[in-house]
């Protein structure tokens, strides 16, 4: 099939790479978000999808909004049979959805109808789920509500962060997306409506969501940190200064809530239940470092607390 692929961030790359290599399909263009300022140098950066398309000489379309008439005209000229989507990052108008004869097929990183929305991987970890997965479905007007073509499951390890889990889902999901497109082309795959029960939503995660609430149980603290790692990142305040947190270890010891205790064996913080041991932390303006190194340099006073 003639494909116009829509995607933007790194997790979309395995899918595009797989479809470029497919002997059955031809990627005639990609649609991605416009170049953006990124990094400490504040340089204009192309999206990972645009960069991969450039490597293969594939035309790149970067409309400010997919409702632009110029974009819709260009998409019509390309005459795609289908438009696969992986984390594109913008809502598609009905005028765009109507152009390809097989519509737009989205790869979503959850087991729909659970965790519709922008941050399904983070939501699954934060909820303490043991199994998640990826789903391919036909895009329609509702939010991630279209009929489903296929699913694949993935175990959530107790040490998984959003980053490690999404990396695996991006690879397994890419295989699912290719299989789905093959079935759609052959006419052997029919989409089925999503269940009306079990619907949940996963809104975009903000930097404020990364602030850790130490009045929560240790298990909830652990899950929250893993869910926002690597982005937007977990953080707390110590002496009024922001401290970024890496994943923590659950321990059996008790400490008063929010109290920091420095020992030879590590840096511990009290929660609503048991304590957690900090692994790596990042003070403002510095790199990630072992928590003990930070604590020694910070010269914390007895009874110091996280805020």
From Swiss-Prot:
InterPro entries: Fmt, Formyl_trans_C, Formyl_transf_N, Formyl_transf_N_sf, Formyl_transferase-like_C_sf, Met-tRNA-FMT_C, Met-tRNA-FMT_N. GO terms for molecular function: methionyl-tRNA formyltransferase activity. Its EC number is 2.1.2.9. CDD domains: FMT_core_Met-tRNA-FMT_N, Met_tRNA_FMT_C. GO terms for cellular component: cytosol. It holds the Pfam family Formyl_trans_N. It catalyses: L-methionyl-tRNA(fMet) + (6R)-10-formyltetrahydrofolate = N-formyl-L-methionyl-tRNA(fMet) + (6S)-5,6,7,8-tetrahydrofolate + H(+). Keywords: Protein biosynthesis, Transferase. (6S)-5,6,7,8-tetrahydrofolate binds at residues 110-113. Attaches a formyl group to the free amino group of methionyl-tRNA(fMet). The formyl group appears to play a dual role in the initiator identity of N-formylmethionyl-tRNA by promoting its recognition by IF2 and preventing the misappropriation of this tRNA by the elongation apparatus. HAMAP family: Formyl_trans. Belongs to the Fmt family. This is Methionyl-tRNA formyltransferase. It comes from Nocardia farcinica (strain IFM 10152). The gene is fmt.
